[in-house]
Amino acid sequence: MLTAGVDHQDLAKRGESLIRQSSNRYLTTVRIAFRAKQRRFDDFDGLLEESSVKPVQRAIVELSDEQDQPDLLPG
């Protein structure tokens, strides 16, 4: 995960990968926005300690990881 900062090239590649592998770009964008909104409220509530990473950046990384490694998901 991201701790001290953001590798912008890696973030761009992850975002492009999410869009490229999706069947619907709009729904992917909505998923990213929804996840970012959740992370923003988690930050506000003090549940997350990684406040140096913006919620949208964190959402892209999380969704990209879920897409690339589906075996890590519970269930």
From Swiss-Prot:
The UniProt entry, under Pfam families, shows: RNA_pol_Rpb6 (PF01192)
CC per GO annotation: DNA-directed RNA polymerase complex
- Where is the secretion signal located? none
> Which molecular function GO terms apply here?
DNA binding; DNA-directed RNA polymerase activity
Q: Does the keyword Transcription apply?
A: yes
Query: Its GO biological process terms?
Result: DNA-templated transcription
Keywords of the record? DNA-directed RNA polymerase, Nucleotidyltransferase, Transcription, Transferase
Report the EC number(s), separated by commas if there are several: 2.7.7.6
Q: Does the keyword Ion transport apply?
A: no
Instruction: From the UniProt record, list the reaction(s) this protein catalyses.
Output: RNA(n) + a ribonucleoside 5'-triphosphate = RNA(n+1) + diphosphate
Q: Supply the InterPro entries for this chain.
A: DNA-dir_RNA_pol_omega (IPR003716), Pol_omega/Rpo6/RPB6 (IPR006110)
Q: How does it assemble?
A: In cyanobacteria the RNAP catalytic core is composed of 2 alpha, 1 beta, 1 beta', 1 gamma and 1 omega subunit. When a sigma factor is associated with the core the holoenzyme is formed, which can initiate transcription.
As for what it does, the entry says: Promotes RNA polymerase assembly. Latches the N- and C-terminal regions of the beta' subunit thereby facilitating its interaction with the beta and alpha subunits.
Q: Which family does it belong to?
A: Belongs to the RNA polymerase subunit omega family.
Tell me which HAMAP family the record gives.
RNApol_bact_RpoZ (MF_00366)
Q: What is this protein called?
A: DNA-directed RNA polymerase subunit omega
